[in-house]
């Protein structure tokens, strides 16, 4: 049919100028109205084509866009809301249109008018219309009614068979007209019926461009995959055929969204698995060869980024493939939230995917189910407004660049979040740095899959998970909004409670009695806290009375702690570390070494957020304290009486004689010890896990009864900003308070040290302070409970210890270590911890764990920095002495900082490696690996340093023909300079033999020399170095009773100044080398 052929191109209306479309439509309408003799089938065609044109209209005609700037409209909630609303009703208007278009069923204008009014009423009864829209309703409804009636009257009635069809058409269009007029935000309606008709039809195209399958959600979602159709269709090539529409390949029906198309294909069976053959045909629609090649190169990758299954994250090459996948797997039924889900498959093997879901999903609900209800309702709410599951792969589903930025800013806390510990970061660089420092990038998958398997799923929650797979956020602490997503997960249960605002706590109180009583009890104690301040000032920790108040039967505290310790030990010995308290040992030690900066840093982290927002105030505490741990995977034990504690102490330390005041502290220490090690959790039986999961409330109240009293003193002396923080911790959290037990600043110091001391006892190791390389946190742990098993050697003044006291413990009520068997004063312990960080750590096996975790070797721990230690090095071999005594000489770079002996050896080796040619020129040849190894062994220089030195010398010689000790190499008449005595030589062999006289041995003997001989030869140098390092600490520059001797020529001088002048003028030595070549002699 010629008519059909003419109209075919109109499907891609987005490519056709709007004016042409309108003109064509006007002609078509006039032809119809003029009563052309069309048979019924042709009139059907007219209707179908009109609707196709309408549906294919470009999106520029959207009613929203006419009111607002188009780009701005994309991101604006107003446009979202109105679009949503329009598509909320699209199903009904489409059904009406289809009914009225059916040529067999005769529809009457009166009926359609009634339908129009119904559509009005429905559209504007929606609560989400703004007041602006309501105003428009008054003006526009009148206009559109006149408009509609005008159309009715202008409809001619030709011969009977045609009249039915054309009336149907007109009825449909009038319904459309009024509907779109009312929803449009433009009050301009044209007077002439024909142009008005075109405008309305264009506007309706936008109105109907929404999907009815998502009508369940009136609120807009931030990250909506349904926005796919807003992508620029030219960018993705054949992904979108026609005017950015999803079309069925079989019947060419156009749909606005992929889901609609999928549903259609499923219902009609319009799909085949062997649909790849048609992909090649699509490319022919591209007009320019350049574009075609562009599409062939990039189109597929882009398509795969966009064509993702929203449920499982798999990519597809064409829409049809994706639709077939959706139909076969029924995944389109499982995406009710309009949220993109990250491809979990990329992060973990599919076998572990379920474990991850289990892990991140809620489990261990409150016995009364209160938290579950609250959480479910909140999560339902959040699913519409927040989407923490953002991965870089999802950005193609967003609307455009501007709104993506806006959404990213709004959700930055969830997007830039460490999946292991939940800490949020401001920039990607910070997150990357955090992952590298803590080793979390290694642990995300392994720990998740390990720990995920043992969690027990709540059935209600399981249903939720079926449709919303969660990303692998393993036992994390999330910022407030996302924490609601996994409300009852073990860590989550703590966090979600912490996060609740006071009102929510009150709600909980009113909830079912079992939970209510426990919570109320806690709340009362906390409220009393300030009044109790006077009497309880002496008891900042748990007392026997507190323990007696709430003995709740249950887990054997001894057994659980033994499990914890034994499994931690076995893990440490087997080299498969799994630290609960800190995700990696690096994390445990990443703190500034000095006390003062640490204290200010902690305060800024913890106190400031509480001013900023009460909701976020806890995140800092969590990140410092609990967060690295699946803290409450093994909650504090129930059984908490003094006899149990005595047995525990007896078993762990073999001592029973412990002061009464220590017991509460031990109780307090043991709980976090138990809490911080997931290792124990892994080795415990599943039934136990279930049991702990089912009684969080009990534990909460148990641990808090004493804790409330303990914290009462805290509130009094913490800075203002911290008070709300502390109160909230006390009210909401089951066991956070135990870990944050002394004062807000060092709240994250305690747990590891307790476990550390237990391990010391079990491993039979002597506890020594940690080495500087592992440094800061470990030292702080020692500070917080530094009862050491071996005598201490305080070398710093006690003043320093007092300073630390003042920073860390305002009440001077120190926590007591579990292994405390000899009661020593704290101050000496503190002094020891601070002053002698140079000996080996008691937990060297822990430092070994670092190697396993990150593959990085821990740096050398033997670099004495204080004078007192330097004497210890006397008996060691020369290399050690040199390494330790001259950190300055270990600097690579300017040669003046090198040990001159090392330079002589290197220069001699280099000169001996030069080969003389027949013409008398010298050719540089590289030092062999053997020689390098010998030099390295003798000097202690690393192979890298030696290679760099050689490379540098060669570079200088090639570039300028000379270097410090060798000139004119390129001319064939080289001059070798001796660094020590400034003498010059013409041949390499004489130069080498001269250097060997300085060294006292020949280069060939380098590898054979015994250490003792080297020591003798180098003792002068080491002594000089010692003098150099002691210089500033020693006596005044010129002692009256000494003379100075030049080592090179043995002349003596009355003052240092004279020797320096002599060295500079006679030997050409630089000032930095003076001390090395000067020996101080006692005057006789």
UniProtKB/Swiss-Prot annotation:
Residues 57-71, 140-152, 859-868 have a biased composition (Polar residues). It comes from the Eukaryota. InterPro entries: HD, Teashirt_fam, Znf_C2H2_type. Residues 49-108, 140-167, 269-298, 467-534, 653-728, 855-879 are annotated as: Disordered. Belongs to the teashirt C2H2-type zinc-finger protein family. Disruption phenotype: Normal Mendelian ratio at birth, but none of the mutant animals survive beyond P0. Newborn mutant mice exhibit a strong defect of the soft palate, vertebral malformations in the cervical and thoracic regions of the axial skeleton and malformations in the middle ear components. Probable transcriptional regulator involved in developmental processes. May act as a transcriptional repressor (Potential). It is found in: Nucleus. Residues 269-284, 496-534, 653-671, 681-714 have a biased composition (Basic and acidic residues). A zinc finger (C2H2-type) spans 246-270, 307-331, 416-440, 976-998, 1044-1067. The modification Phosphoserine is found at residue 771. Residues 891-961 bind DNA. The keyword Isomerase does not apply. GO terms for biological process: anterior/posterior pattern specification; middle ear morphogenesis; regulation of gene expression; soft palate development. One of its GO terms (cellular component) is nucleus. GO terms for molecular function: DNA binding; zinc ion binding. Interacts (via homeobox domain) with APBB1 (via PID domain 1). This is Teashirt homolog 1. It comes from Mus musculus (Mouse).
